[in-house]
Amino acid sequence: TFIGPLLVIKEDPSDGSAGEAAEPKVPLWQSIKQTLANKTFLIYMSSVATFFFGLQFFLGGLAFIAADMMHITEAQLGLMNAAAFAPIPIMLILFNLITKKWGAKVAFRAALLIFAVGMLLFPLTWDQLNIPVSPLIIGIIATGIGSFSIGAFFTIPYAFPAHIAAVDAEQTGKNRAGMFFAVQGVINQFMGSLAGAVLTMLLTWKFGVVAIGPFVALTMVLAFFLFKNYPLGKPTAKQS
């Protein structure tokens, strides 16, 4: 799956236009160093890596929350997942409206805080609290709140690196979009693995499953503040 596309990319155009208007090639190691030296990208990745850690932490722990804390069936867990994913098309429209009015930066930071709010509701689903509201209902509300953020999280890893790469290309004259996406992918894969390891350790604690929601909320708030100095993602100026 990786080698095939690479071979196609390396082929010369069939119309004989090879070499015409070709951009100067940047050596691999130099491209990596330039990518990691891009301050805007580092601000972006510090926040995205943190939120991705939290997101993977939650996704990995959701089954434990359902089984060990809420004591609900797989069918009921499916209802919670539906509450999270079914509204995403509408949430993407809302995310785009916020982006147009206040900019992608504000929209992303709002998504982080909204997801944190949803995560803070999950401890209330612990059936040992004997809250008069069903844990399933609270879980559906929590995941429903998080659906806005999930829709945004589908967009961010594609839109932001593309914008950063476009600005970088204007400044350097070299299009290295692929490297920005590659570095992001490697970092996020590492954070996903780290999230799984930390989750395993947390679940050894008696109340570890109850702490999953607040822990994820904390990572989202941290990502919110890490994104504060991101210089791009401002609203588009209205044309008179």
Regions found by a protein language model. Give the residues of each.
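Membrane-embedded alpha-helical bundles of multi-pass transporters/translocases
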Residues: T1-S240
